[in-house]
Swiss-Prot record:
Its EC number is 3.6.-.-. This is tRNA modification GTPase MnmE. GO terms for cellular component: cytosol. It is found in: Cytoplasm. The keyword tRNA-binding does not apply. Pfam families: MMR_HSR1, MnmE_helical, TrmE_N. Keywords: Cytoplasm, GTP-binding, Hydrolase, Magnesium, Metal-binding, Nucleotide-binding, Potassium, tRNA processing.
Length: 458
């Protein structure tokens, strides 16, 4: 496949030590060499770095002092010639370098175009390309490991094996249909076909078993901290974040808006939402905050209910317990450093089997137990993201689910005595659906849509 030469700034814009301009294309080296004062880049070896200066050809003025990396096709990310120019960080100089490159007839890259070329040139498949963005967005070590595993092609290999098994079954059916007179070909009986289809269905189900944990690692858990005013919600947020993000006072109703913060709890990414204290109020601004708190509570994956150890449960407390029934929630009984007034038996009854953790946030007690409870709630035992293949992408999960249903339709058809050549249609469809995960059978418009979500320069 032949493409034009593209360039973009690959590092985040702003002040910093280093900024990188990436150029990819058959004549990338020649284009950069025109504005580079130093060694003749067209003659240097691949995968080498060279010191020099970028020069404005119109004024012969030195624009930047740079280090230039030369990588020759096909041993590059895009399988094209790649040049990476390491400039000083900042807005003016790096943009000037980019402008000088574009002036040589190079096109500004679209978002994700470098990774798209890696896919179109066969270096990576679609699932590996999507893992690149997952790695960039990873918020925990576990999420990073899952993304790296997918980038290395672990999911691709699993999908490839399944597609190959379906393809061999389809070929076997085809031989039986077209050449029934061949005695040396094993007859594709209904029993053999059910056995093969059942195995594929089981393998798909096995992959999908990791989807809940995979999605959590990729997207995080939306976690709402709720409770009456002044029970310690903001203190809980600050303790989990290990930084003062929310105002903590003895004045009820201090938090009037929703505060969001990402935090890594034992490898589990939480999107923490500290809500306004829920109570009846005449204050218009506070009332708006209370309504938003209830909305966030209904949308959250996990709810942390905070109650006060030094106060008896109120009707408002009990209403909160009723409101979260059917959701994952943990009860935090805070302020155990003060005399007990709360009925712990009643709290346990209202928790209906969910974990109850006692804390004294002012004395930093109970946070470790809470973090363990959160991790245990979503990950039974230990999660080994280094050795397992987790499916975390919603697109992949949807396609695997669809393929599993199609295989199930094929099995039901076989059991109902449908002719094998009709069953072949369902198996072929399942093979095509699985191919959409790796990009083997995906439509071009979907490819464009997926890569448009990438950042510029990647």
């Amino acid at each position: 496949m032949e493409f034009d030469t593209i360039a973009a700034i690959s590092t985040a814009l702003g002040e910093g030590a280093i900024a990188i301009v990436r150029v990819s294309g058959d004549d990338a080296i020649e284009k950069v060499d025109r504005i580079f004062k130093g060694k003749d880049l067209t003659q240097v070896s691949s995968h080498t770095i060279h010191y020099g200066h970028i020069v404005d050809l119109d004024t012969n003025q030195v624009i930047e002092e740079v280090m230039v990396s030369i990588m020759r096709a096909p041993r590059t990310f895009t399988r094209e010639n790649i040049v990476e120019i390491n400039c000083h960080g900042g807005l003016v100089s790096v943009n000037k370098v980019l402008q000088l490159i574009l002036a040589q007839g190079v096109r500004l890259a679209e978002p994700g175009e470098f990774t798209k070329r890696a896919f179109l040139n066969g270096r990576i498949d679609l699932s590996q390309a999507e893992a690149v963005m997952d790695l960039i967005r990873a918020k925990t070590d576990r999420a990073m490991n899952v993304a790296i595993n997918q980038m290395e092609g672990r999911l691709s290999k699993l999908i490839g094996h399944l597609r190959q098994e379906i393809l061999e079954t389809l070929a076997h059916i085809e031989v039986n249909i077209d050449y029934p007179e061949y005695d040396d070909v094993e007859e594709m009986t209904h029993n053999i076909l059910i056995e093969k289809a059942t195995h594929v269905r089981a393998e798909i189900a096995k992959i999908l078993e990791t989807s809940k944990q995979g999605k959590i690692l990729r997207e995080g858990i939306s976690t709402a901290i709720i409770g009456r005013p002044n029970v310690g919600k903001s203190s809980l947020l600050n303790s989990l974040v290990q930084e003062k993000k929310a105002i903590v006072t003895d004045i009820a109703g201090t938090t009037r808006d929703v505060i969001e913060e990402y935090v890594n709890v034992r490898g589990v990414p939480l999107k923490l939402i500290d809500t306004a204290g829920i109570r009846e109020t005449e204050d218009i601004v506070e009332r708006i905050g209370v309504e938003r708190s209830k909305e966030m509570m209904s949308q959250a994956d996990l709810v942390l209910i905070v109650v006060n150890y030094s106060e008896a449960l109120t009707n408002e407390d009990e209403d909160l317990f009723r409101a979260v029934q059917g959701k994952d929630f943990i009860v935090i009984v805070n302020k155990t450093d003060l005399p007990q007034e709360i009925d712990m038996e009643r709290v346990t009854d209202l928790a209906v089997g969910n974990r109850v953790i006692t804390t004294s946030l002012i004395e930093e007690q109970g946070i470790d137990e809470l973090e363990k409870a959160i991790a245990d709630l979503f990950f039974e035992g230990t999660i080994d993201s280094a050795d397992m293949t987790y499916v975390s992408n919603a697109r992949h999960i949807g396609l695997l689910t669809q393929a599993g249903r199609t295989i199930n339709d094929a099995i039901e058809a076989i059991e109902n005595g449908v002719p094998i050549d009709m069953v072949q249609i369902d198996l072929t469809r399942a093979w095509e659906i699985l191919g959409e995960i790796t990009g083997d059978t995906v439509h071009e418009s979907l490819i464009d849509q997926l890569f448009s979500q990438f950042c510029l320069g990647k």
